[in-house]
Structure formats: structure tokens, C-alpha cells
UniProtKB/Swiss-Prot annotation:
Pathway: Amino-acid biosynthesis; L-homocysteine biosynthesis; L-homocysteine from S-adenosyl-L-homocysteine: step 1/1. This is Adenosylhomocysteinase. Binds 1 NAD(+) per subunit. SMART domains: AdoHcyase, AdoHcyase_NAD. Keywords: Cytoplasm, Hydrolase, NAD, One-carbon metabolism. The gene is ahcY. May play a key role in the regulation of the intracellular concentration of adenosylhomocysteine.
Length: 479
């Protein structure tokens, strides 16, 4: 596998990062991560000569971590040009951003950036230098995580026609987003509508962003095709489950040093993220309770031996609370008023509004260390809020391990190649990658683990009605 060569272009300044001097550290960690990312590195090696992304100008909005740096270098090795920002104000690893900037890639990401900065950086990843003849250059692909880059172009284009769509922000984040759009429209009244039609498609990483895409398409608002990377089996059943199983506890431990054994850990939501989170807590001998709205998921939790309760009941009994739903106000102000002194509250879903953090602003906040706060209630009770309700594994830790991110990012790279090279095959809509590509990613990942795959005989393949080389399961199969 060929590692990317890092070069330092002279007079390059198209970036906003914390500290360029961290680049050597970042580069060393990138080299280590490459050895743990067999799927992604194999894709890089397979397609490097063909340059399938030559001409692609990718706007990337995804956590600026060491693993993402390997993804960026892979996209570039396949011919793409990229501009990058983080999709979360706390998830950037500053040494990773420094390494990417030092290599000459435009990156706009600082751990702990403000929301105003966040939306400014999201605009910056759509702003390319003019070409040699002075003509404007625009992004033609988006690689998104949570859907913010996609949202920005769509909402901004609507605001050009009807400014009233920016009149009623529902959160602090929307206030910053709307103000940022107004600021750019004041300078260029067609900033968004010039860029939106240039986009050939988007590949979306996470559950929350995929939900947004399906909703936009249902409402007739989606302007370009999208590939739902999240629902590739080698993404959702691995990144979401096994990634969270390792990174959740890492984030909580780094933030609090709490002893988990014996504690009541309340896991809100029992999808793939919730399943991994519950397994992690049980592995450290917590008493795991689960809250769920879906009777099927609730039954799964019960059959695994978890106690299924409501949040109303759990609030006054739990020691550690983790939201994993992708929904809104799963832990409310009223729930937190009932909690024990020193209860730990955190989120591992994409957005911070799973916890009603805005309602806590009325109380005294005592910062313990970065991304760890005591919220002091009028009666003197304190709860510990991690990462201000944003992703605890990335805000307080370093996120998922490289190996599991290799599966996700191999899928992202394949999806970018497919959508860029075969745009005409994809009218506006939301698509998933075919199963044979899912199986390909799994095969590439297995090599690192020295696994031995059994090969079907011709008779066996004929008996179950599949090809010897797969795919082995029908599209409707639930892994």
C-alpha cells in the first residue's frame, strides 16, 4: 500500500487551523492510522492509476480527525481536489488539521471553534480560487456528515428568493446559521444559487444527515442525487455499533475518570449506536437501562438482559446518561431537574439537541476542563455535562478507532467515485451502494484480521441460488 507523500507548498495560506507547528505530530499519527485502515488503503492502491476522481472538486464536511486525514489523502491520490471543514465544533484534532494544511490542502477546522466560526468555515469550503484565466471555480461534489454542507446551499438558495425563511431561528445554532447566510447575501445576492447547480451529488455519512436527505427529497427540495453511505452494512453495523462500543467509554473516562462498574447507565435509544453503547457499559459491569420508543428495539434490549424503562422513571435513578437517538429533547430540562447530584449527562448522537441544553443556560455553569462542565441548579445540585451535549466520543476523546473508520471511509470513497463517474445514472434521489460493494469492503477489512473465508462449491452456490463470488444475501436481508 502506498502512503501519501506530504509536501509543504510555499506561501500556502488557504486554511484556518489552531497551530501549523503540530503538523509533524499529525503526520506521524496519520502514518500509524494507515496501517489500521486496510480497506481504505486498498481502495487507494486499486484506483490510484486510473484517477477516477480527476476533475472532482469535493467540499468535505466531516470530523477533522487523523482518520479523516487518511480519507482526504486517499481522495487526493485518486485525482480529486478538496476543501475541508469539521462537521462539529469540538471534534477537530488540531494536529490532524495541521498535517493536512501543511500538505497544501485547504482546511478550516479548530477544536473548540465558535458556532459563528463553524458556519463561516462551512462557507469557506465552497469558495475556490479562480482558475488561471480568472474564471470562477465551484465545488462539484459534497462529502457530508450530518448534512450541514448540503443544508447550507439549499437553505441559502431559498433565502435568495424569500428572506423570510431566515426570520424565525429555533436555536442558538440556527441564529448563527441564519446570520451567516444573511452576511454572505449582503455581499453577493446570488452566492448560493451560483453554487447549488454545480453540485453533481453528495455522499452522506451519518444517520442524521440521511434522515435530512430523505425528508428533503420527499418534500421535493433536494437539488441533486445523494448516496446514503450510512446504510451500507459495512458502515452502520460496524462504525455505528463497534465504533461506539469502543469510543463512548473512552470519551467518558477521559472527561470524568468515573468508575463505571456498579453504576446505573441509562442508554437512550437502542439502534446500532445504542447497541454498541450498551455493550460498552455492560462490559465494564454497569447496570444498563435502555429507553426506547420502538417496540422491536425495546424487545431486542430486553432479550439482551437490559432493563427497559422510560426516561421519566430513569431520570432520578441513573448515574450516567447517554443519548443515542438522533431525535430532539430526549433528555429534557424536567428530566435533568430530577437527576442525582453529580449525574453524568452526555450524547453520542450527531446533534446537541438530543439534550435540552438551551434550558440549562439559566443556571450557573462551572467549567472543570475543556468540554466538561458542572451545571449548578438553584438547590445546589450539580450535574456533569460533557461536550455541551455534543458528541462525547469526539469532544472528550479521539472518536472511533482507525480500523472501523476504514470501513466507513472505504464506502465514502467508493460512493464518491460512483456518483462522480456515473452521474447520469442517478436522477435526483437518495440511493444506497449495491451489496457487492458492501461485501468488497468487508473482504478488504478481513485481511487485516487474518480471517479465512470459506468458498462455496459450485453445487452449494447452485443449491442456495447465488454466485460463488456473491452477493450472498438478498437486498432485504437484515444483518
Amino acid at each position: 500500500m502506498n502512503a501519501a507523500v506530504m509536501t509543504s507548498p510555499t506561501n500556502f495560506s488557504d486554511y484556518v487551523i489552531a497551530d501549523l507547528s503540530l503538523s509533524a505530530w499529525g503526520d506521524k499519527e496519520i502514518r500509524i492510522a494507515e496501517t489500521e485502515m486496510p480497506g481504505l488503503m486498498a481502495i487507494r492502491e486499486e484506483f490510484a492509476a486510473a484517477q477516477p476522481l480527476k476533475g472532482a472538486r469535493i467540499t468535505g464536511s466531516i470530523h477533522m480527525t487523523i482518520q479523516t486525514a487518511v480519507l482526504i489523502q486517499t481522495l487526493e491520490a485518486l485525482g480529486a481536489k478538496v476543501r475541508w471543514a469539521s462537521c462539529n465544533i469540538y471534534s477537530t484534532q488540531d494536529h490532524a488539521a495541521a498535517a493536512i494544511a501543511a500538505a497544501g490542502t485547504p482546511v478550516f477546522a479548530v477544536k473548540g471553534e465558535t458556532l459563528d466560526d463553524y458556519w463561516e468555515y462551512t462557507h469557506r469550503i465552497f469558495e475556490w480560487p479562480n482558475d488561471d484565466k480568472g474564471a470562477p471555480v465551484y465545488s462539484n461534489m459534497i462529502l457530508d456528515d450530518g448534512g450541514d454542507a448540503t443544508l447550507l446551499l439549499h437553505l441559502g438558495t431559498r433565502a435568495e428568493k424569500d428572506a423570510s425563511v431566515l426570520n424565525n431561528p429555533g436555536s442558538e445554532e440556527e441564529i448563527c446559521l441564519f446570520n451567516s447566510i444573511k452576511k454572505h447575501l449582503a455581499v453577493d445576492a446570488t452566492w448560493y444559487s451560483k453554487r447549488l447547480p454545480q453540485i453533481l451529488g453528495v455522499t452522506e455519512e451519518t444517520t442524521t444527515g440521511v434522515h435530512r436527505l430523505y425528508q428533503m427529497h420527499k418534500e421535493g427540495k433536494l437539488a441533486f442525487p445523494a448516496i446514503n453511505v450510512n446504510d451500507s452494512v459495512t458502515k452502520s453495523k460496524f462504525d455505528n455499533l463497534y465504533g461506539c462500543r469502543e469510543s463512548l467509554v473512552d470519551g467518558i473516562k477521559r472527561a470524568t475518570d468515573v468508575m463505571i462498574a456498579g453504576k446505573v447507565a441509562v442508554i437512550a435509544g437502542y439502534g446500532d449506536v445504542g447497541k454498541g453503547s450498551a455493550q460498552a457499559m455492560r462490559a465494564l459491569s454497569a447496570q444498563v437501562w435502555v429507553t426506547e420508543i420502538d417496540p422491536i428495539c425495546a424487545l431486542q434490549a430486553a432479550m439482551e438482559g437490559y432493563r427497559v424503562v422510560t426516561m421519566e422513571y430513569a431520570a432520578e435513578h441513573g448515574d450516567i446518561f447517554v443519548t443515542c437517538t438522533g431525535n430532539y429533547h430526549v433528555i429534557t430540562h424536567e428530566h435533568m431537574k430530577k437527576m442525582k447530584d453529580q449525574a453524568i449527562v452526555c450524547n453520542i448522537g450527531h446533534f446537541d439537541n438530543e439534550i435540552e441544553v438551551a434550558a440549562l443556560k439559566q443556571y450557573t455553569w462551572e467549567n472543570i476542563k475543556p468540554q466538561v462542565d458542572h451545571i449548578i441548579f438553584p438547590d445546589g445540585k450539580r450535574i456533569i455535562l460533557l461536550a455541551e451535549g455534543r458528541l462525547v466520543n469526539l469532544g472528550c476523546g479521539t472518536g472511533h478507532p482507525s480500523y472501523v473508520m476504514s470501513s466507513s471511509f472505504a464506502n465514502q470513497t467508493i460512493a464518491q467515485i460512483e456518483l462522480y463517474a456515473n452521474t447520469k445514472n442517478y436522477p435526483v434521489g437518495v440511493y444506497t451502494l449495491p451489496k457487492h460493494l458492501d461485501e468488497k469492503v468487508a473482504r478488504l477489512q478481513l485481511k487485516k484480521l487474518n480471517a479465512q473465508l470459506t468458498t462455496l462449491t459450485t453445487e452449494q452456490a447452485n443449491y442456495i441460488g447465488v454466485q460463488q463470488t456473491g452477493p450472498y444475501k438478498p437486498e432485504h436481508y437484515r444483518y
